[in-house]
Amino acid sequence: MAKVLVLYYSTYGHIEQMAHAVAEGAREAGAEVDVKRVPELVPEDVARKSHFKLDQSAPLARVDELPNYDAIIFGTPTRYGNMASQMKNFLDQTGGLWMKGALVGKVGSVFTSSASQHGGQESTILSFHTVLLHHGMVLVGLPYAFQGQLGVSQVMGNSPYGASTIADGDGSRQPSPIELDGARYQGRHVAGIAAKLAG
């Protein structure tokens, strides 16, 4: 049985919803799954005034626990085509793990959200992949075997790089059923590959 960590940062709750869908999919594949988040960096009074979702139940992750997992599925909103600073801050603390090669051979995967269809989802995931490659992780995306990323009949996220959702500029759009299905599929897919690699 693979041990999977879903590690995310969510400002308004979109990535939080996707994270739980990813975890659900990984559990369906028989994995042992933990869902954790990285710390908020924005001062609490500013976050409250900006209507951040501060009641997220997932516990905070610690850098030193990352090697305990066979796979880590990361979730971050897009910030100008890159990961959020909260996630980058957490990853910047993994230098000690890099020095030891502690994540070499682990499965890494990424899901994201953006305000618009062209808001940088793919560049966010691809730039995130650079960090995972430096750690020697095995990259897994969302294959076209998931049919929910095909077609243009509706506004939707998801790409072969990873599951995604579109939040709209004011955050009013919630993850759609097809986007959540993509997240669940990615969770199942990653868990299945991690189980094979873990032997």
Curated annotation (Swiss-Prot):
GO terms for cellular component: membrane. It comes from the Bacteria. Its cofactor is FMN. This is NAD(P)H dehydrogenase (quinone). The lineage of its organism: Bacteria, Pseudomonadati, Pseudomonadota, Alphaproteobacteria, Hyphomicrobiales. Keywords: Flavoprotein, FMN, NAD, NADP, Nucleotide-binding, Oxidoreductase. Its EC number is 1.6.5.2. It catalyses: a quinone + NADH + H(+) = a quinol + NAD(+); a quinone + NADPH + H(+) = a quinol + NADP(+). It is an enzyme of class 1 (oxidoreductase). FMN binds at residues 10-15, 78-80, 113-119, 134. Substrate binds at residue 98. Belongs to the WrbA family. NAD(+) binds at residue 12. InterPro entries: Flavodoxin/NO_synth, Flavoprotein-like_sf, Flavoprotein_WrbA-like, FMN_Rdtase-like_dom, NQO. Residues 4-190 form the Flavodoxin-like domain. Gene3D superfamilies: 3.40.50.360. It holds the Pfam family FMN_red. Binds 1 FMN per monomer.
